[in-house]
């Protein structure tokens, strides 16, 4: 399938993708829901009346909102109908937009003229710890090889509740956090800027569909109906603050200062060709977490760092999302097994995605092995992030000549306020 809209070679956004986002322009500061196609954005508010199928005819107003929450809250058949209609309208064989110059001029906006915003109002944010390679590496560093994985790790998707208010969209700079740290040889903690600033290469999915009532669970057979779409996520971390504060309740200030997400939400339907077999799980998890259908995604991921004053990004790690041990379905089913209600717009992070080799580690903590190794970044070296470093995450699926991308997830570290 091809679009009448020109799609540059190696674009993240061919007609097979069609991710959703929220944008504004200098000419119109109002926020609108859009779909990326090539280097353009299709403004869905301008074509809302064209969604006239059985699922969406009575819900055209969802495309005129300033966030995706109302659309996300519709059931999955509505998402499928919207995607099919947008593909039809953008296809080279459909005259509705192609031959209507006036409508086309209103509905298509150059991405270069747009400012992207968070795609949804995020009510709650949960971060999992689903990479066995990352969990093993961190366990070896802090507890030794014999106790790398905690006893519960292979029985359930470990997670914690994060801070939704400090989630920001790609391109937002962040200040180095300050807090308490304690050096190994110090008798008391000290206060000041974190010296061990880190990124975490993650992906996250937005919850959609009608809310499950408090006290009811989402069975794993129905979990896909609640997974709206996927974004890149950088779970910025202050490792020295984390090391001092995390016992016994887990991360707090070391994580809550900022989390960056990419602006374009790639639907599960767009990613369907890239599902691969799930990892072997030993021991076999409890029945409520068991599913045989492939729901592991083959997404090539990379992290680059651009030091201040440098003109280019330098890749420091390459890995793949398929290395995760726990699937998205398992994460969602586990989250609700106690009766927790999930709402449209909630965000669930994967945890750091690391592969089995050193170059596939998804954090500076692992790449530098807790500061014991130097990581080349162009002509410079790093053990952790310095002020002025700009970090970018990228993700691409490729199969049968079709490339599906996620855009950028970029943020720059600014000096701390002391």
UniProtKB/Swiss-Prot annotation:
UniProt feature coiled coil, ranges: none
Binding-site list for Mg(2+): 235, 255, 259
Reactions it catalyzes: 4-fumarylacetoacetate + H2O = acetoacetate + fumarate + H(+)
MF term (GO), any: fumarylacetoacetase activity
Tissues expressing the protein: Highly expressed in the intestine and the hypodermis.
Known cofactor(s): Ca(2+); Mg(2+)
Region forming the signal peptide: none
Assigned keywords, A-Z: Calcium, Hydrolase, Magnesium, Metal-binding, Phenylalanine catabolism, Tyrosine catabolism
Name the UniProt record assigns to this protein: Fumarylacetoacetase
Amino-acid positions noted as binding Ca(2+) in the UniProt annotation, renumbered to this chain: 127, 200, 202, 235
Transmembrane segment boundaries: none
Described purpose of this protein according to its UniProt entry: Fumarylacetoacetase involved in the tyrosine degradation pathway.
Catalytic residues identified in the record: 134
Gene Ontology terms: biological process: homogentisate catabolic process; L-phenylalanine catabolic process; tyrosine catabolic process
Pfam families, alphabetized: FAA_hydrolase, FAA_hydrolase_N
Highest taxon of the lineage: Eukaryota
Family: Belongs to the FAH family.
Result of knocking out the encoding gene: RNAi-mediated knockdown from hatching results in stunted growth, reduced fertility, progressive destruction of the intestine by adulthood characterized by the thinning of the intestinal wall and loss of intracellular lipid droplets, which eventually culminates in lethality. RNAi-mediated knockdown results in activation of cellular stress pathways, and thus the intestinal damage is most likely due to activation of oxidative stress responses and ER stress responses in the intestine. The reduced fertility phenotype is enhanced in response to exogenous tyrosine or homogentisic acid.
Record-linked Gene3D superfamilies: Fumarylacetoacetase, N-terminal domain (2.30.30.230), Fumarylacetoacetase-like, C-terminal domain (3.90.850.10)
EC numbers: 3.7.1.2
Top EC group: hydrolase
């Amino acid at each position: 399938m091809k679009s009448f809209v020109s799609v540059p070679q190696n674009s993240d956004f061919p007609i097979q993708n069609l991710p959703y986002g929220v944008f504004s322009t200098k000419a119109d500061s109002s926020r609108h829901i859009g779909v990326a196609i090539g280097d353009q954005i299709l403004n869905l508010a301008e074509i809302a009346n064209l969604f006239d199928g059985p699922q969406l005819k009575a819900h055209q107003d969802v495309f005129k909102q300033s966030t995706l929450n109302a659309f996300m809250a519709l059931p999955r058949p509505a998402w499928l109908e919207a995607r099919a209609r947008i593909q039809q309208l953008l296809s080279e064989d459909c005259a509705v937009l192609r031959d209507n110059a006036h409508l086309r001029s209103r509905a298509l906006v150059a991405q270069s003229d747009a400012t992207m915003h968070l795609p949804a109002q995020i009510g709650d944010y949960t971060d999992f710890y689903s990479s066995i390679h990352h969990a093993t590496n961190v366990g070896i560093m802090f507890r030794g090889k014999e106790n790398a994985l905690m006893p519960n790790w292979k029985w359930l998707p470990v997670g914690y509740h994060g801070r939704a208010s400090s989630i920001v969209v790609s391109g937002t700079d962040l200040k180095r956090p300050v807090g308490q740290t304690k050096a190994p040889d110090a008798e008391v903690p000290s206060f000041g800027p974190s010296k061990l600033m880190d990124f975490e290469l993650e992906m996250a999915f937005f919850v959609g569909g009608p809310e499950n009532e408090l006290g009811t669970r989402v069975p794993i057979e129905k979990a896909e109906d609640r997974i709206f779409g996927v974004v890149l996520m950088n779970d910025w971390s202050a490792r020295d603050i984390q090391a001092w504060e995390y016992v016994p309740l887990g991360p707090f200030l070391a994580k809550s200062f900022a989390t960056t997400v990419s602006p374009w939400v790639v639907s599960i339907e767009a990613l369907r060709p890239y599902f691969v077999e799930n990892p072997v799980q030993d021991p076999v998890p409890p029945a409520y977490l068991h599913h045989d259908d492939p729901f592991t995604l083959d997404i090539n991921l990379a992290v680059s760092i651009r030091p201040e004053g440098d003109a280019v990004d330098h890749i420091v790690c390459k890995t793949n999302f398929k290395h995760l041990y726990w699937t998205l379905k398992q994460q969602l089913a586990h989250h609700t097994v106690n009766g927790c209600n999930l709402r449209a717009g909630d965000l669930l992070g994967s945890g750091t995605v690391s592969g089995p080799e050193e170059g596939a580690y998804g954090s500076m903590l692992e790449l530098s092995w807790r500061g014991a190794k130097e990581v080349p970044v162009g002509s410079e070296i790093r053990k952790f992030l310095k002020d002025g470093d700009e970090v970018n995450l990228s993700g691409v699926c490729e199969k049968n000549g079709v490339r599906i991308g996620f855009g950028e997830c970029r943020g720059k570290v600014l000096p701390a306020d002391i």
